[in-house]
Amino acid sequence: MKIIINGLGRIGKLVFRRLCDENLHKNILMVNEKAGTASDQEYFLRYDTVHGTWGDDLCFENGCLNYKDHSIDVMTEGSIEDISFPKSEKFLVVDCTGVNKSEKLLEPYFERKASYVLI
């Protein structure tokens, strides 16, 4: 199943790094983080004041994060409604924003055909 990570703060970065470390990077379809630009996300993922430097195989090219041989779309939207979700694939959203904690706030994910949401 494809994975979308919404929020690349402390938890989102750790989820991203762990998926890559476990060789599951090809399952990551997209990341969304409203803070910074799309190209900033490579820097934020690579350098962490607590967890150190990571991601020798990570780079930002052509509007995407590339890890090893896999391209990951990057968005910088502030609301769920503005994120361009896939139309045909089943996907899991890992919401690491810390904001969307109630069923009502998670509804937009399911309206956009998310199969599962993990908060």
For every predicted segment, state its role.
Residues M1-I119:
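N-terminal Rossmann-like NAD(P) cofactor-binding subdomain of oxidoreductases
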